[in-house]
């Protein structure tokens, strides 16, 4: 009996020891890190200046970036990373500063913050340049950038591509970073992807595999769509031939891609015809609402991520540096910097959109047949956005004349709801869907605009303009399906409604753009150790057919809902 107890006790001790060992191994096997982007550091002004007509946020700029507060926001972000004992390193996917091409001192200031962080914590920072960081014939060229940020990836690099900011570095024993400079230094915002850069990524992905490492890619420009109408409204913010590029990256074994540039918090997923899955995590600007970054915990089996925010700064240091902040500003910041940043964003976005509502800004040239129609619509849009939504003489009353019901809400005017929707996109994990009250109000405002302003225009002019718009937006392939579905729901479609459908056809498709089952801010995806490649020809064919069929059915289903809300 004693012998049996002894054996049992030994077994318990052995199993317990193994369990402890496996637990310790699991903890050691985790890789924890933070990802931020678009810091857009500005040297703070000596004194604030009134830039817009807003009661509180009168110093907001057209980009809605908290420029004077930016340095302190970066400080607090680094403080949070330092305080997190599990955080092993920090990735920053470009636009470290705002005016880096012409004001080199901004880079020096940011590098000093990074050096202090690394010296105090021992945690490395890895950077990649963005379109604001360097240029040709500028105060900062790529050699200057690499020299200033030598300690933040380049000195530890396994490979460096001369004349660019691209490099590779091992993050730990299992993972290798491929830091790709996606910029064209001769351009303002568009990408500089080339066959040579793609081939370099291919070589580095193969080398990582040969060395027993999983490749993680970081670049500034988006790999996948993150914004409704991105190919139209933000065509310079995503790499060219993005699906082809995503297919190559996925089939080369890259699963995680970190990008910035678009200033939105969004996660997008794509599956190549071979069945390989790739995720593009676009991280919003750290110094704009919602002052957000992501935190990742990576194991072979699973990649967990969560959004974290900066909700306070040293306001004493702020007022000591820049004069002009009122006590109301400081009180609102101290009550919650995130709420303050949202108000700042809405004020800045309204100012920017008010300046940008021009046909040329929308990519519609003056010689286009539908230019006049669009110009009429845009002119009416500004009026509808500015007028009160409710009350005597308000938009709700005007809409009723066209049998359009504007639901009651707390919004004051059209600008209020439009900027709210924009803020949701910046924050990610958008809380709206096509059934929501807020989307209904927005769509019916657009419907009212077109019905009120275009009702007197001849049908043949509207029909021709509609067909050319379908072609301009690249949605002409679904004209017949859209028209058939609209007729089945609404009956015969008028020329005004047909033009309206053409104008918003990209928006229709955009409502399914984020319907991919991947949460933007908080979630989990399969790790690098999971197998998803399906290389058999039959599987490849099935993947293509299933994907195409799913997209088509999703568009048509949601279009039906959209029409009921939009047309009224």
Where are these regions (language model features)?
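Hydrophobic core
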Residues: 9, 13-20
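Beta-strand-turn-beta hairpins that frame and shape the catalytic cleft
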Residues: 26-34, 43-47, 164-179, 210, ...
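N-terminal active-site segment of His-dependent metallophosphoesterases
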Residues: 26-104
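Non-catalytic terminal accessory segments
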Residues: 27, 317-568
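Divalent metal-coordination and catalytic microenvironments
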Residues: 38, 90, 95, 110, ...
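Active-site environment of divalent metal-dependent phosphoester hydrolases
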Residues: 42-45, 98-101, 129-138, 185-188, ...
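His/acidic metal-ligating clusters that form di-metal
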Residues: 81-89, 119, 176-178, 188-279, ...
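Extended active-site neighborhood of metal-dependent phosphoesterases/phosphodiesterases
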Residues: 105-200, 206, 274-277, 290, ...
């Amino acid at each position: 009996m004693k012998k049996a107890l002894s054996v049992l006790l030994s077994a318990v001790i052995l199993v317990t020891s193994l369990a402890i060992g496996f637990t310790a191994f699991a903890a050691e096997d985790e890789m924890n890190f933070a990802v931020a982007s678009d810091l857009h550091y500005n040297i703070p002004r000596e004194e604030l200046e009134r830039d817009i007509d807003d009661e509180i946020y009168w110093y907001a700029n057209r980009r809605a970036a908290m420029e004077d507060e930016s340095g302190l926001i970066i400080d607090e972000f680094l403080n949070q990373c330092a305080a997190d004992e599990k955080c092993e390193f920090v990735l920053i996917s470009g636009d470290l500063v705002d005016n880096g091409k012409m004001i080199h001192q901004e880079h020096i200031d940011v590098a000093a913050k990074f050096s202090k962080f690394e010296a105090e914590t021992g945690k490395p920072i890895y950077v990649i340049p963005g379109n604001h960081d360097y240029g040709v014939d500028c105060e900062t060229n790529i050699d200057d950038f690499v020299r200033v940020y030598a300690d933040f990836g380049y000195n530890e690099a396994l490979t460096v591509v001369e004349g660019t900011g691209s490099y590779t570095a091992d993050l730990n024993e299992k993972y290798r970073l491929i830091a790709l400079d996606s910029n064209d230094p001769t351009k303002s915002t568009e990408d500089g992807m080339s066959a040579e850069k793609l081939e370099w990524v291919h070589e580095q992905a193969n080398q990582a595999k040969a060395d027993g490492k999983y490749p993680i890619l970081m670049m500034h420009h988006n790999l996948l769509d993150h914004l409704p109408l991105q190919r139209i409204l933000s065509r310079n913010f995503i790499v060219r031939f993005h699906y082809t590029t995503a297919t190559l990256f996925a089939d080369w074994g890259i699963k995680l891609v970190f990008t910035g540039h678009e200033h939105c918090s969004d996660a997008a997923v794509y599956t190549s015809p071979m069945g390989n899955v790739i995720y593009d995590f676009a991280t919003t600007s750290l110094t704009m609402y919602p002052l957000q970054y992501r935190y990742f915990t990576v194991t072979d089996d699973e990649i967990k991520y969560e959004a974290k925010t900066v909700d306070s700064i040293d306001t004493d240091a702020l007022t000591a540096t820049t004069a002009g902040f009122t006590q109301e500003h400081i009180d609102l910041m101290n009550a919650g910097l995130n709420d303050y940043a949202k108000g700042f964003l809405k004020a800045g976005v309204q100012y920017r959109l008010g300046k940008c509502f021009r046909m040329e800004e929308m990519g519609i040239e003056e010689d286009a047949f539908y230019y006049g129609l669009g110009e009429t619509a845009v002119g009416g849009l500004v009026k509808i956005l500015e007028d009160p939504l409710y009350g005597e003489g308000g938009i709700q009353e005007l809409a009723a004349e066209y049998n359009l019901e504007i639901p009651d809400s707390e919004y004051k005017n059209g600008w209020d709801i439009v900027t709210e929707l924009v803020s949701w996109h910046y924050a990610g994990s958008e809380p709206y869907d096509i059934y929501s009250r807020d989307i209904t109000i927005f769509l019916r405002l657009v419907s009212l605009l077109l019905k009120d302003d275009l009702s007197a225009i001849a049908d043949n002019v509207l029909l021709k303009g509609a067909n050319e718009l379908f072609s301009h937006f690249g949605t002409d392939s679904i004209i017949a399906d859209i028209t058939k579905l609209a007729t089945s729901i609404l009956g015969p479609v008028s020329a005004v409604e047909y033009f309206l459908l053409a104008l918003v056809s990209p928006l229709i498709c955009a409502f399914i753009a984020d319907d991919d089952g991947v949460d933007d801010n908080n979630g989990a995806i399969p790790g690098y150790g999971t197998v998803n490649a399906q290389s058999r020809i039959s599987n490849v064919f099935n993947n293509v057919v299933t994907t195409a069929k799913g997209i088509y059915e999703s568009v048509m289903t949601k279009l039906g809902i959209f029409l009921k809300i939009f047309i009224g």
